């Protein structure tokens, strides 16, 4: 269950109520100016129980951003209205708090497994097909923390009528020109004794080519999208 929070800049002095108790909202810090310059807009902020451990709930305080400029460009040209790229940053909190002497590293394996499963499920809920988990690697954040980075592969096929993809029609296999390979990334790390999750997804092919339109706003490809997303992930704290 999600507990919506009014969109606001990097503030941590808000609260939400759950089961009669008032809890602080501890949103992660994100590079606001970089996001604004890149055409990203804040889609929502939520605080929700992401999953439960035997003795506690794990609450996720999340900021979700979408590439509004890319979405508008596609909508203007072909009438398909959906987010094509997204980026999120999450700070996890435990309710009740971890007991004295037990740090986040002691539950890292469990949290990591659940986070990876949840991210794959989220990609599927967004209409992406054939979601699969790929390789794992390491990366350094801008604060010097070491993060685990996992790649996800998926696909999306725009419906010519403007609806969601189904991936079940004839001619919609991975070799079909209108099928868009999608890449997702999920990073997990510990910063200042608290878990951070960050990630997102983007099309692997230029949307101008896939949608057969001439528009420089749709010309960017995977290298540009990949580097921008990974830079945003590194900047989360």
PLM region descriptions:
Residues 1-35, 237:
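Secretory targeting signatures
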Residues 197-237:
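Surface-exposed amphipathic alpha-helical segments
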Residues 36-52, 125-139:
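Short secondary-structure junctions
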Residues 115-185:
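Signature of long, low-cysteine stretches enriched in small and polar/charged residues
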Residues 32-47, 229-237:
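Short conserved aromatic/hydrophobic patches within beta-strands of well-structured domains
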Residues 182-206:
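Extended hydrophobic
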Residues 38-111, 145, 170:
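Secretory pathway targeting signatures of secreted, lumenal, and periplasmic proteins
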Residues 3, 22-23, 27, 89, ...:
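A composition-biased, non-transmembrane "mature-region" signal
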């Amino acid at each position: 269950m999600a507990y919506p929070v009014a969109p606001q800049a990097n503030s941590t002095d808000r609260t939400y109520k759950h089961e009669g108790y008032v809890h602080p909202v501890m949103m992660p810090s994100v590079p606001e100016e970089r996001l604004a310059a890149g055409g990203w807009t804040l889609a929502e902020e939520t605080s929700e129980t992401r999953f439960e451990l035997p003795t506690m709930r794990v609450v996720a305080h999340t900021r979700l951003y979408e590439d509004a400029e890319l979405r508008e460009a596609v909508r203007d040209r072909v009438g398909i209205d959906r987010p094509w790229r997204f980026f999120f940053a999450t700070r996890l909190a435990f309710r009740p708090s971890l007991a004295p002497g037990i740090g986040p590293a002691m539950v890292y394996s469990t949290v990591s497994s659940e986070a990876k499963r949840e991210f794959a499920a989220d990609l599927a809920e967004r209409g992406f097909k054939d979601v699969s988990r790929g390789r794992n690697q390491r990366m350094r954040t801008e604060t010097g923390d070491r993060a685990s980075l996992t790649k996800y592969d998926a696909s999306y096929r725009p419906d010519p009528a403007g609806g969601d993809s189904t991936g079940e029609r004839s001619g919609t296999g991975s070799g079909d020109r209108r099928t868009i390979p999608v890449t997702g990334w999920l990073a997990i790390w510990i910063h200042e004794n608290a878990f951070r999750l960050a990630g997102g997804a983007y099309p692997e092919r230029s949307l101008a080519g896939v949608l057969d339109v001439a528009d420089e706003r749709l010309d960017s490809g995977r290298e540009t999208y990949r580097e921008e997303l990974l830079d945003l992930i590194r900047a989360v704290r």
